[in-house]
Every structure is written in C-alpha cells, then in structure tokens.
Amino acid sequence: MPHIELKTVEQLRWMREAGLVVASIHEALRAAVRPGITTRELDEVSAQAIADGGGASNFLGYYGYPATVCISVNDVIVHGIPGDYELAPGDIVSFDCGAFIERGGKQWHGDAAFSVIVGEQFIEDADFAAGTRATGAIAGVDQDLLRERRELDAVTRESLWAALAGLATGKRISAVGKAVETVVAENALINGWEAGIVEEFV
C-alpha cells in the first residue's frame, strides 16, 4: 500500500497560508476582468497579487513558462499563455493560479483555478450553492452560445463542490476525481452534451 504522509498542524498552517495567497490572486483577477483588457495585463495583476501576499510564483519559469498565471479563453482547454488577446463580452475564461511560500526550509504550494464569463457579475460561492445562476442577455453575444457557456460554468462549479464534499478523513485523493467525473457525466446525459474529462491533461 502506498505511503500516506500525515501533515503536522504547523505544516497544515503553511499549506493554508499558500492557499490564501492563491485566493488573493483570484480576488484580484475577478475584480480586474472586463472587456478590452488583455490577458497579459491580467498576468500583471496576478504577479502583483502574489507579491502583495508575500509569495512567489510557482508557474513563472517552470519549464520556461513565461507568466504567473495560465489564462485559457473559450476553446483553449488549459494552460493558455497570457498575451495580447483582448477579452470580449461573452468570453468564458479560465484562470489557473498558483503561488508558493517558503517555511520550515521547504516550499509550500497553492494552486487553484476558477472561470468567469466576461460581462457577467461573478456569483459568489455561497450564492451559487443556494441556487443563484446568471440570467439575461449580454449585448452582442449570441444567446445560445451564452447559454452553453453558462451551463459549462455551472457544471464545472458543481463538480468542484462535489469533489470537496467527497473529501473526508480516511478517504483517498482518488475520491476527488471520481466525484468530478460523476457530476460531469450526469450533466452531460441530462443536457445531451458530448462532454467529459479531458484525460490527456489529467
């Protein structure tokens, strides 16, 4: 059976500290997203948030990666590189954010992603859990496309919460992946999608 390393209370505190730096990146990026801003400018927002939080980027320079955040727009699945692209209303944008801190002679890493639809107000987690969903039109955006992107965003967030609910004492990390896959598969069946996990990136 594989060895499972148990963390000390102090180590868990350091892990949380790294996670809070990543949470601050999320907050800064959500506040900055707007039509017309470039993904490179959003990377600058990310870099500033990392510095303000007392962390360092665990993306910048990794195998030559040139930025502090991965920004994937529309049909880019993952690991999009920030550049000159200007966000447009209705774009669905995924931000994969990371940072680390150094404590106790080691690096402690945080890494988390979120998605937004440009031109819509971000629905906070508590409101989303209570059933709040985006409605209405975004000027100049095809409504069928917008509906599909809203559905994708909602299912993704639902799968995240299912994964978190699957974590418990004595459970293995594989429970997270199983929970995500189950939610995606169930919603694909309900909505008639051809959807699933992109296994090549897992």
Language model: regions and residue ranges:
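Active-site neighborhoods and metal-handling regions in enzymes and metal-associated proteins
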Residues: M1-V202
